[in-house]
Amino acid sequence: MTIKKMEAIVKGLINAGYLKNKMVSKALLTVPRHEFIPAELHDYAYVDTPLNIGHGQTISAIHMVAIICDALDLKEGDKVLEIGTGSGYHAAVVAEIVGKNGQVITIERIPELAEKAESTLKKLGYTNVKVICGNGTLGSSEFAPYDKIYLTASGPDIPNSLIEQLKKGGKLVAPVGLYIQDLILLEKKNGNIIKKNLGAVAFVPLIGKNGWHNEY
């Protein structure tokens, strides 16, 4: 792992105000991003950009992983649901933050990606991550409720099925929209649903029963 490159990225994110949680900073410096991308892209592992992982999917840019983790206000011991495993990198970062007393449930619709991510996470010792191959727009009621939920693909709206699986006082972060997307922070607070727009983003489409029905 090119630690100096990641240190420079993390320092830049802190200076730009994107990264306030020291636990997120530590996790970014710990997880070897190069392990989650194709070998031919290893030279770009510690460049703050999305990278192609096959099947029309990408590993998110480092700053986007940081922004989502920061917005979720992750705590040690949290149970977290991720929709869109992709490479497994984001799940590994979250797993570092929530620790061995926490748990990450991550759902991936593409079998090949789910299998590869599970293999990589297992190799790196992330025993607190469970990979499920299935329709992420439905969530996973088996392990609900969750302290935090986040999506790595953008749907027409935040699926009610996921909001229902969020604990009272929980937080959910999701990109919403198709060609024009916004990153939305949703909180269940005092019996109300509160939403905040965190800014414009660009994610792959959320495919499934409660998402888009086709690739765009």
From Swiss-Prot:
Keywords on record: Cytoplasm, Methyltransferase, S-adenosyl-L-methionine, Transferase
Pfam family, one: PCMT
Gene Ontology, cellular component aspect: cytoplasm
Single GO biological process annotation from the record: protein repair
Catalytic function, reaction form: [protein]-L-isoaspartate + S-adenosyl-L-methionine = [protein]-L-isoaspartate alpha-methyl ester + S-adenosyl-L-homocysteine
Annotated catalytic residues: 60
Keyword S-adenosyl-L-methionine: yes
Alphabetical list of InterPro entries matching this protein: PCMT, SAM-dependent_MTases_sf
Main location: cytoplasm
Keyword Cytoplasm: yes
Known EC number: 2.1.1.77
UniProt-annotated location(s): Cytoplasm
Similarity annotation: Belongs to the methyltransferase superfamily. L-isoaspartyl/D-aspartyl protein methyltransferase family.
PANTHER family membership: PROTEIN-L-ISOASPARTATE O-METHYLTRANSFERASE (PTHR11579), PROTEIN-L-ISOASPARTATE(D-ASPARTATE) O-METHYLTRANSFERASE (PTHR11579:SF0)
Protein name stated in the entry: Protein-L-isoaspartate O-methyltransferase
Organism: Methanococcus aeolicus (strain ATCC BAA-1280 / DSM 17508 / OCM 812 / Nankai-3)
